[in-house]
Swiss-Prot record:
Induction: By p53/TP53 following DNA damage: expression is directly activated by p53/TP53 (at protein level). Changing residue 185 to A: Loss of DNA-binding and inhibition of E2F1-dependent activation. Impairs DNA-binding and dimerization. Residues 595-618, 686-699 have a biased composition (Basic and acidic residues). In contrast to classical members of the E2F transcription factor, atypical members contain 2 DNA-binding domains and regulate transcription in a DP-independent manner. Both DNA-binding domains are required for DNA-binding and are proposed to form an intramolecular structure that is similar to the winged helix structure of the E2F-DP heterodimer. This is Transcription factor E2F7. It holds the Pfam family E2F_TDP. It comes from Homo sapiens.
């Protein structure tokens, strides 16, 4: 009974706390929960049979131990979802080598573990995985198998610059066996090397090794082809398109209009008519062609950095269809293969470009950049490898690309030059017509200085080539107009001659010894002679002080007759000849220097002197201003923009005159060789301009003669060494005919001048013949200059070129010792690029052509130099007059002050 009562109490007691829990639920839930747990634990305490089950479970734990690795196996099954683990699983399942190794290990493992045969498939699987791991340790890593490392091993087998006599044949089978790779891995390397002409295909799987000998030529050709295919503009277009897309996403529309409407007008380079994306033929899709195009992108890029996505969009046919996107990715991997080989060749290196959307893989060109197009024979890449270029497509690209250039950020300098030109034209002076294309020349030539300098160096290494009738020196490099002489107004009446006049090979300097001085003299008698000049038809106006020779070059040596040998500085002359298309003027007034630099002033005002000086050493065109002033003209310096390049006495030139002709031919003299002991004297070079003008007005008789000769790029420049040998009375013109004076002159002609009309006399009488004791019996050559307003002719014959072994000349005029300095205009020193003159045999007795010379009665005002042959955007009455009438009116107003002459706007009759 008691037991039953206890049992009933025990049955009732749990219900009571549950009722209590139901009642007191809202008051203290946590306490009730604890109380309920305790009450529940209380009746379960007598039932203690369950711990026995727990002990049984503990006893079975050793049996369940083999199950725990199964859980790890289950965890490992989640890993193959990653690409790397999935690749490992595929390799282990598919590779026959791995299966063979597993079979061999499985055959011997049961024999070794007979007693443990119970360790069934689970343990065998674990051991198999460890075997795969061991095999993976033995296998090379991905880095060891990389194409770049494989290419390095491949290149290490062959010399970079093999001997011309040694012929190396590459067998792809042998290379694949020696490097331990499949032959298909070698194909990628060989295709890229073949695109750069490092190897050439001989037979099937046989290639010949050439090395890097022809690599610069190949790269130069690839650069030219890349420029023809407009890759630079395509890259600029794609980059701008990305920027426009980013701006569009951020809601930043361009101020100049909707970018979408503009992009429709521009070229879509993904169209199939574009040659870069027209990868229709199988040949265009080959790795070799893609490699060449990839290299072109680097060669035409300004930054030499090409991002991979831009390269892929240009080089790979990117279709808008979704199924072709995988093909696009596959071809991007091919670009990586090309880049790996080029990296092994040390031509590019991998960099990362940080943009708005994050880092992008890119490659930077670290190979040679020291080449440009030249006239020497190049390897024809397009004929051997590249597909033919579609000319009609280029025209379509060029039209749209020109629209793009105006709004691309890198071409803002063109707009700047237009603004500066407008400032220059709006100054208070009469505008004249100027040559088409010369408006932005003064700025554009600065950016092209390196290209021109390299072209001159390349031309100098080629053959000596003949004079050309029409000279487009810069047309092969840039659409800029051919080198203008200077920007001169119609007062100079510069009109191109129809024929070349002089051409002198630099090796003709060897015809005489610089140490022996001049061996021939030319008499300058001021007689009017205009008979045979008409054959040249230069259309020159009367009274012009310039002769414009647009073709070949001229070498003149004005000797100092009392200083012994008139030996000009070889290095100085070499710099004259090395300054590419040169403009030479014989000038006396410093106002001429100011005129010459007037156009350069607007952009030079804000530049420091050092930067301006360095830029002037790079730019062209050039001008040698050689005064015939008396000794006090040393006080006359150039404008302040000339720096310390203003004056150099001819005595310093003669000091350096003992350089041999071979050193002149070498062309290695730099611009520093022009610097003499007096250049470093800033006190002489920084004289103000007002004293110059005062001296100019006080010294009317010592006026100037101009001889302006322009030579095309690569030909001999105009070489003049003028001694201090003219006094003002002998040079200064008057209203009547000028008095005669003697100038020792040597002109060495070049053989190409045969077909041109010449005036030749074996013995011309001249007033200098009595003084020329060292001349041969043939006699001197007449050198006639006009009176004012008349036309004269320069008669140069072979008698001016005499035996170099003859003695030095005596003094023809003891007064010809007064010229002390050589003033270089700032335009002259624009380009000191050194050129190696082409060697040619010495033709001493070859006749030369006729030059028209004119004498200016007045050194024109500083503002008178304006450009010619283009209508400016506004007209004043001064732009309508006859140049001769305007010049004569300026003769009458000669004595006015410089400030008045600067603001003077002369008027004349209508044309």
């Amino acid at each position: 009974m008691e037991v039953n009562c206890l049992t009933l109490k025990d049955l009732i007691s749990p219900r009571q706390p549950r009722l209590d829990f139901a009642v007191e639920d809202g008051e203290n839930a946590q306490k009730e929960n604890i109380f309920v747990d305790r009450s529940r634990m209380a009746p379960k305490t007598p039932i203690k049979n369950e711990p026995i089950d727990l002990s049984k479970q503990k006893k079975f734990t050793p049996e369940r131990n083999p199950i725990t690795p199964v859980k790890f196996v289950d965890r490992q099954q989640a890993e193959p979802w990653t690409p790397t683990a999935n690749l490992k699983m595929l390799i282990s399942a598919a590779s026959p080598d791995i299966r063979d190794r597993e079979k061999k290990k499985g055959l011997f493992r049961p024999i070794e573990n007979k007693d443990d045969a119970f360790t069934d498939s689970l343990q065998l699987d674990v051991v198999g995985d460890s075997a795969v791991d061991e095999f993976e340790k033995q296998r090379p890593s991905r880095k060891q198998k990389s194409l770049g490392l494989l290419c390095q091993k491949f290149l290490a087998r062959y010399p970079s610059y093999p001997l011309s006599t040694e012929k190396t044949t590459i067998s792809l089978d042998e290379v694949a066996v020696s490097l331990g790779v499949e032959r298909r891995r070698i194909y990628d390397i060989v295709n890229v090397l073949e695109s750069l002409h490092l190897v050439s295909r001989v037979a099937k799987n046989q290639y010949g090794w050439h090395g890097r000998h022809s690599l610069p030529k190949t790269l130069r050709n690839l650069q030219r082809l890349g420029e023809e295919q407009k890759y630079e503009e395509q890259m600029a277009y794609l980059q701008q398109k990305e920027l426009d897309l980013i701006d569009y996403k951020f809601g930043e529309r361009k101020k100049d209009g909707d970018p979408d409407s503009q992009e429709q007008q521009l070229l879509d380079f993904s169209e199939p008519d574009c040659p870069s994306s027209s990868a229709n033929s199988r040949k265009d899709k080959s790795l070799r062609i893609m490699s060449q195009k990839f290299v072109m992108l680097f060669l035409v890029s300004k930054t030499k950095i090409v991002t991979l996505d831009v390269a892929a969009k240009i080089l790979i046919e990117e279709s808008q269809d979704a199924p072709d996107h995988s093909k696009f990715k596959t071809k991007v991997r091919r670009l990586y293969d090309i880049a790996n080989v080029l990296t092994s060749l040390a031509l590019i290196k991998k960099v990362h470009v940080t943009e708005e959307r994050g880092r992008k893989p890119a490659f930077k060109w670290i190979g040679p950049v020291d080449f440009s197009s030249s006239d020497e024979e190049l390897v024809d890449v397009s004929a051997s490898v590249l597909p033919e270029l579609k000319r009609e497509t280029y025209g379509q690209i060029q039209v749209c690309a020109k629209q793009k250039l105006a709004r691309h950020g890198s071409f803002n300098t063109v707009q700047a030059s237009e603004r500066i030109q407008r400032k220059v034209n709006s100054e208070p002076s009469s505008p004249y017509r100027e040559e088409q294309g010369s408006g932005g020349y003064s700025l554009e030539i600065g950016s092209l200085a390196a290209v021109y300098r390299q072209k001159i160096e390349d031309n100098s290494q080629g053959k000596a080539f003949a004079s050309k009738r029409v000279v487009p020196p810069s047309s092969s490099l840039d659409p800029v107009a051919p080198f203008p002489v200077l920007s001169v107004d119609p007062e100079y009446c510069v009109n191109p001659l129809a024929h070349p006049v002089f051409s002198v090979a630099q090796t003709d300097l060897q015809a005489f010894s610089m140490q022996n001085g001049l061996n021939g003299q030319v008499d300058v008698s001021l007689a009017s002679a205009a008979s045979a000049v008409e054959s040249l038809k230069p259309a020159l106006l009367a009274g012009q002080p310039l002769v414009y020779v647009p073709s070949a070059s001229l070498f003149m040596l004005y000797g100092s007759l009392q200083e012994g040998p008139a030996s000009g500085s070889g290095s100085e002359r070499d710099d004259r000849s090395s300054e590419a298309p040169a403009t030479v003027e014989l000038s006396s007034a410093p106002s001429a220097q100011k005129r010459l630099c007037e156009e350069r002033k607007p952009q030079e005002e804000d530049e420091p002197a050092t930067k301006r000086q360095s830029r002037e050493y790079e730019d062209g065109p050039l001008s040698l201003v050689m005064p015939k002033k008396p000794s006090d003209s040393t006080d006359l310096a150039s404008p302040k923009t000339m720096g310390n390049r203003a004056s150099i006495p001819l005595k310093d030139i003669h000091v350096n005159g003992q350089l041999p002709a071979a050193e002149e031919i070498s062309g290695k003299a730099t611009a520093n060789s022009l610097v003499s002991s007096e250049w470093g004297n800033p006190s002489r070079n920084t004289d103000v301009e007002k004293p110059s003008k005062e001296n100019e007005s006080t010294k009317e008789p010592s006026l100037l003669q101009y001889l302006c000769v322009q030579s095309p790029a690569g030909l001999n420049g105009f070489n003049v060494l003028l001694s201090g040998s003219q006094t003002p009375p002998t040079v200064g013109p008057s209203s009547g005919q000028l008095p005669s004076f003697s100038v020792p002159c040597m002109v060495l002609p070049s053989p190409p001048l045969g077909p041109f009309p010449v005036l030749y006399s074996p013995a011309m009488p001249g007033p200098v013949s009595s003084t020329l004791g060292a001349l041969p019996n043939t006699g001197p050559v007449n050198f006639s200059l006009p009176g004012l307003g008349s036309i004269a002719q320069l008669l140069v014959g072979p008698t001016a070129v005499v035996n170099p072994k003859s003695s030095t000349l005596p003094s023809a005029d003891p007064q010809l010792q007064s010229q002390p300095s050589l003033n270089l205009s700032p335009v002259m020193s624009r380009s000191h690029s050194v050129v190696q003159q082409p060697e040619s045999p010495v033709y001493v007795g070859h006749p030369v052509s006729v030059v028209k010379l004119h004498q200016s009665p007045v050194p024109v005002t500083p503002k008178s130099i304006q450009r010619t042959h283009r209508e400016t955007f506004f007209k004043t009455p001064g732009s309508l007059g006859d140049p001769v009438l305007k010049r004569r009116e300026r003769n009458q107003s000669r004595n006015t002050s410089s400030a008045q002459r600067r603001l003077e706007i002369p008027s004349g009759g209508a044309d």
